Structure formats: structure tokens, C-alpha cells
């Protein structure tokens, strides 16, 4: 699907790129202001919380209102880093290696589902978002931080022209349209903001289940 890659190839790309992603956290979290966005939106998470594509656990410290925290990621490299970083944490996180597009949880399992900078890397982002919707309680919420195609034309053209390199190096579709993906997955946007040339999105979503 993505550059004609199989799921196995996609996972291999992510495991290879995991260490570089972890090492680049300063520029992403501080320079680009992602840490500030994490604190702002994930402080809204409450009850039983699921972090889809939890990576090395960068969201966990911001889940201050959570009753329980469960994290899932398809990268064993990322999960190993998450386990190490959580070793002395004052809270417990239940970590799982698994597929965001086939979550091994019953329907309506979580009060809040969160994900950050992940839909760009899911093999099938629509299916992953629909799975988040499925496991979220009808009166729950889904909180996302995502990145996509810039609203500034010069930046957007750069993203388009270098998409192939981004996929090959890190398995990232950096010119996607996150809000369109969310709508296509059947979720309702309650609140959304865009920052940094329109690249970064924060979204509060409702599962919007019928019946």
C-alpha cells in the first residue's frame, strides 16, 4: 500500500528508525512545541486511558487524571525503551506489543483513547482510527496530536516532493490530512487547532456511535 510495501517491510522501517526518532526528541518536543501540546491536550484524559502507538512513552507523564494507563505499539524497539523509561515512574503502565488496526480489547473498553504523531505511520490509518473508535466508550473521547500537510504552499510542496524519502527513512506520510482521515473514520471533531505553519493538529474527538 505505502510505496508498495508490505506490513512486514513497514514494521522493519519503523524498528530501524526508532532510535533516531527517540534521539530527535529535543527538536520535536521543545523546538516544535510538541511537549507543550501534549501537556495541554492529554491533561484532559481521564478514567481508563489507552495510548495507541505509545512509542517510548512520551505521553505517559501528561496523563495526570488517568485511573489506569494502557499503551500499545507495534515496534518492539519503542516498547523496550518505554519499559526502561517507566522503570522508576510513580505510576504503572500496562504495555502491549500489537497492531493498532486490530486492537485486542473489547468494544467500549476505555474512557479515553489517545494517540500522538502516529496516524502518519499506521499501515492503514483509517482502520486504526476506527479501532480507536470501537474500543472507546460511547460517552468517552479520543484525543489526538497529529501532523500533516502544511497550509503554507511552499512548505506543502516541499513535503510533497520529499514524501518518498520520508517513507523510506522513517515510515512517515508527512503530507497526509489528519482531519480528513478522522472524518473518514466516522469520528466527530469537537475541537481542533493547527500550529507551526498548519502542520501540527490537536483534536478532541467524539466516537459518535449510532444508537
Report each predicted region and the residues it spans.
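C-terminal alpha-helical "lid/dimerization" subdomain adjacent to the S-adenosyl-L-methionine
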Residues: 8-9, 25-28, 143-202
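Short glycine-centered segments of the SAM/dcSAM-binding site in methyltransferase folds
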Residues: 68, 139-141
Amino acid at each position: 500500500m505505502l510505496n508498495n510495501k508490505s506490513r512486514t517491510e513497514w514494521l522493519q522501517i519503523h524498528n530501524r528508525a526508532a532510535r533516531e526518532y527517540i534521539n530527535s526528541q529535543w527538536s520535536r518536543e521543545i523546538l516544535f512545541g510538541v511537549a507543550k501540546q501534549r501537556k495541554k491536550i492529554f491533561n484532559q484524559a481521564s478514567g481508563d486511558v489507552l495510548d495507541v502507538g505509545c512509542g517510548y512513552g512520551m505521553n505517559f507523564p501528561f496523563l495526570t487524571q488517568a485511573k489506569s494507563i494502557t499503551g500499545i505499539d507495534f515496534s518492539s524497539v519503542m516498547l523496550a525503551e518505554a519499559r526502561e523509561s517507566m522503570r522508576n515512574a510513580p505510576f504503572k503502565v500496562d504495555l502491549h506489543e500489537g497492531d493498532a488496526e486490530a486492537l485486542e480489547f473489547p468494544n467500549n473498553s476505555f474512557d479515553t483513547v489517545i494517540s500522538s504523531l502516529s496516524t502518519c505511520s499506521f499501515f492503514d490509518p483509517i482502520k486504526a482510527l476506527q479501532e480507536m473508535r470501537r474500543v472507546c466508550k460511547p460517552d468517552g473521547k479520543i484525543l489526538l496530536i497529529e501532523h500533516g500537510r502544511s497550509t503554507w504552499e511552499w512548505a506543502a510542496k516541499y513535503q510533497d516532493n520529499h514524501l518518498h524519502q520520508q517513507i523510506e527513512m522513517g515510515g512517515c506520510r508527512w503530507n497526509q490530512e489528519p482531519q480528513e482521515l478522522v472524518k473518514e473514520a466516522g469520528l466527530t471533531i469537537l475541537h481542533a487547532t493547527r500550529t507551526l505553519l498548519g502542520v501540527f493538529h490537536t483534536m478532541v474527538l467524539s466516537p459518535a456511535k449510532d444508537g
